[in-house]
Amino acid sequence: MATINQLVRKGRKRRVAKSNVPALEASPQKRGVCTRVYTTTPKKPNSALRKVARVRLTNNYEVSSYIGGEGHNLQEHSVVLIRGGRVKDLPGVRYHVVRGAADTAGVDKRRQGRSKYGAKRPKS
């Protein structure tokens, strides 16, 4: 415990908050180009083939980013928009591809939660 005299001399140190999404550099989204599109398997106890893209951003960071939704049209050299948000069962994947922005198509035949997958309103 610090004495009052020590606190007068030094003061308390502020804790520095560490970002979970450093590659965004305090932006809401960043644009990038896919360098590799592949599937990978999640950690135990889950089992699937998760779709992931390796993306080279405009600020020269290279990050892994998850492609949500059923089916996608991404390949190497596709331009994508990424946002923050990690995937808990894929280590090292801390970003999501924004569906329906840049070269990424929205999920077709999507009826609920459409805004999260870039799907237009169906013609009833």
Swiss-Prot record:
Basic residues bias locations = 111-124
GO MF assignments: rRNA binding; structural constituent of ribosome; tRNA binding
Q: Which domain of life is it from?
A: Bacteria
Record GO biological process: translation
Q: What PROSITE patterns is this protein classified in?
A: RIBOSOMAL_S12
Alphabetized, the UniProt keywords read: Methylation, Ribonucleoprotein, Ribosomal protein, RNA-binding, rRNA-binding, tRNA-binding
Which positions carry 3-methylthioaspartic acid?
Answer: D89
What the entry lists under InterPro entries is as follows:
NA-bd_OB-fold, Ribosomal_uS12, Ribosomal_uS12_bac
Which protein family is it in? Belongs to the universal ribosomal protein uS12 family.
Q: How does it assemble?
A: Part of the 30S ribosomal subunit. Contacts proteins S8 and S17. May interact with IF1 in the 30S initiation complex.
This chain's function reads: With S4 and S5 plays an important role in translational accuracy. Interacts with and stabilizes bases of the 16S rRNA that are involved in tRNA selection in the A site and with the mRNA backbone. Located at the interface of the 30S and 50S subunits, it traverses the body of the 30S subunit contacting proteins on the other side and probably holding the rRNA structure together. The combined cluster of proteins S8, S12 and S17 appears to hold together the shoulder and platform of the 30S subunit.
Tell me the protein's name: Small ribosomal subunit protein uS12
